[in-house]
């Protein structure tokens, strides 16, 4: 079954039923970025889980004449579920009528990247959140076309993600910071100006606030208090 989605509201009605951490406002950012992809271009997603973000990207990609490469190794673990999560991902993409525009690559992004030779129009990074993996995932930006967009989830929320951005983007010369929607940061592949770097630095108080809240939640759990999940 092939399904056409004419607007964001239509695809979000489908995507919001899929478990995940992407908010409606962040999903709209993905939709807008993918909708502006060039016909025939490729959108790469690193970290797909059960397909919540994949469905949004793929629906917009179809309308734009683009395709999506979804990269996720579907490893075992309490948060991820291994092969069972892959089954759910494939079922969700199929149920959304988007299977024909999604190419699943069930491998680690760090293993796929060295041999990658395709140009990327939009890159969405939401894989493993440790500093070293995110640092490697940011190397995928070398394949993004000039003027293309890079979206990074859990920026200024995850310690590993944020440190990697500060080290490789703030100090780099190829990505311009455009802003964020909660923890979803937006970048453009273009040489940044000093004002762009300053804009990134201004986000640090929000990051420190998030780290403080996360630490407080963990301390609270030690004393038997169970509250909402970590802020994203």
At which residue positions do the language-model features occur?
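Phosphate/oxyanion-binding active-site loops and adjacent basic polyanion-contact surfaces
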Residues: 22-26
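S-adenosylmethionine/decaboxylated-SAM
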Residues: 2-17, 27-232
């Amino acid at each position: 079954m092939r399904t056409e989605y004419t607007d964001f509201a239509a695809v979000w009605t489908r995507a919001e039923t899929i478990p995940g951490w992407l908010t409606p406002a962040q999903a709209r950012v993905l939709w807008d970025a993918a909708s502006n992809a060039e016909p025939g271009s490729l959108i790469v997603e690193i970290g797909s889980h059960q397909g919540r973000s994949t469905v949004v990207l793929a629906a917009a990609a179809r309308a734009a004449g683009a395709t999506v490469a979804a990269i996720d190794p579907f490893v075992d673990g309490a948060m991820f579920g291994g092969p069972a999560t892959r089954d759910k991902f494939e079922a969700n993409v199929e149920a959304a009528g988007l299977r024909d525009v999604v190419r699943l690559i069930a491998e680690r992004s760090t293993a796929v990247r060295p041999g990658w030779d395709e140009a990327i129009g939009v890159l969405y990074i939401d894989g493993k959140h440790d500093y070293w993996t995110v640092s490697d995932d940011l190397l995928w930006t070398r394949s993004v076309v000039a003027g293309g967009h890079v979206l990074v989830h859990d920026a200024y929320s995850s310690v590993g993600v944020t440190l990697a951005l500060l080290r490789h983007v703030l100090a780099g010369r190829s990505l311009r910071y455009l802003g964020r929607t909660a923890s979803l940061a937006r970048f453009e592949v273009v040489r940044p100006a000093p004002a762009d770097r300053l804009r990134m630095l201004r986000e640090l108080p929000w990051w420190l606030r998030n780290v403080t809240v996360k630490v407080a939640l963990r301390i609270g759990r030690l004393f038997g208090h169970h509250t909402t999940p970590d802020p994203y």
